[in-house]
Regions:
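Solvent-exposed soluble domains appended to multi-pass membrane proteins
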Residues: 1-191
């Protein structure tokens, strides 16, 4: 199985804008940002509010610039979270971002408009961080992080289930990229 590439920008570009990874190209990094047609522009034209959440700095990979140039109305990042909740260079823990997102999504739902929201986690990226309040079964860092990521998703779904917008929401869970092993090229040659 293949993902959109081996970098976060490949996942955002491929998943939300339907473009494949291009060898040695970082499409989100350009100073002059071209307009791409993707799910955000299509849904925004049809009356949807468009949001993107990340646990960390929205300037990483120029995510905020790219998303806003391509019909994302609001990007929520570490600049929005209470500073005491930022635990690593990757910002807040995933479960905190999920909890933080629910009242914001409620505000958008209260406006009577449908919305699309992408919530990008970072718990499976180094430096690995598992909050003290979560006790994984595994002693292995990689497995503990997987357990924590699963827990974080369950926190979000339990909170979302209580909201009025839950019954009309399609939840799609995807990876922004595959696990990086030994890579000679940015993409597998068989791709």
């Amino acid at each position: 199985a293949y993902t959109a590439g081996i970098h976060t920008y490949n996942g955002i570009y491929g998943t939300l804008f339907s473009y494949p990874s291009l060898y040695r190209q970082h499409p989100m990094k350009n100073c002059s940002m071209p307009k791409y047609h993707g799910i955000y522009s299509t849904l925004r034209k049809n009356g949807y509010s468009t949001l993107f959440f990340t646990t960390h700095d929205a300037q990483f990979d120029n995510m905020e610039g790219f998303m806003k140039a391509n019909d994302c109305e609001r990007v929520v990042s570490d600049a929005d979270y209470p500073s005491e909740e930022i635990k690593t260079t990757l910002g807040v823990p995933d479960d905190f971002m999920f909890r933080y997102s629910v009242p914001i999504l409620n505000d958008y739902a209260a406006k009577g408009k449908p919305f699309i929201a992408t919530l990008m986690t970072s718990s499976d990226h180094g430096p690995y961080y598992v909050p003290d309040y979560f006790q994984p079964k595994s002693d292995d860092d990689r497995n503990a992080v997987i357990e924590y990521a699963d827990y974080s998703l369950s926190v979000f779904l339990k909170e979302a289930r209580k909201q009025s917008w839950f019954k009309n929401t399609l939840f799609v869970f995807i990876a922004d990229h595959g696990a990086i092993g030994y890579c000679v090229y940015d993409m597998q040659l068989s791709y």
